[in-house]
Amino acid sequence: MPSRIGIDLDNTILRYDEVFYSLAQAELWIDRNCLCDKDAIKKELTKNAESAEKSEKRWQQLQAWAYGKDISKALVYDGLFNFTKQARLRGDELFIVSHKTEFSNFDPSVNLRRSALDTLGQRGFFKSIIQGGLGFSLQDIFFASSL
């Protein structure tokens, strides 16, 4: 029996570790020997900032960049394309869910949802399977604001 499967966009479909790392490195906010991992980067920001407030502002700035103007640099997790194609062959219904707000409080000039959709389009998510894509439509994408 086919299933209905929702896949979380951020940190399940798209991987941001390298984006956060390169952005934080460019700003000289982390040491070069910091692990390329979001949690490690956040800890490094805390260690290197003059205050907790400064650390949190830097983290929010990184998030605004990574989920907005630099989202196209995020990598698709290994195995996602194969999983999606196999699920479609089984007849499963697939959906993408994101709790991304429309605009970042830190940088309201970039529409985070539009940036995400553009990136998915560039990666072939909206192309048919026959065209080498993943066969999603805009109706398969759900943005749900967090409380």
Predicted regions mapped to residue ranges:
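Active-site neighborhood of HAD-like aspartate-dependent phosphohydrolases
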Residues: M1-R58
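Short His-Asn-centered micro-motif
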Residues: I7-L9, A74, V97-H99, F143-S145
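Short, solvent-exposed loop/turn segments at secondary-structure junctions
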Residues: T12-L14, V19-F20, K100-S104, L147
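Metal-dependent phosphoesterase signature
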Residues: K43-K85, L89-D92
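Substrate-recognition element of Asp-dependent hydrolases with the DxDx(T/V) motif
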Residues: I71, L80-L120
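C-terminal cap/substrate-recognition subdomain and adjoining C-terminal extension
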Residues: D92, F106-L147
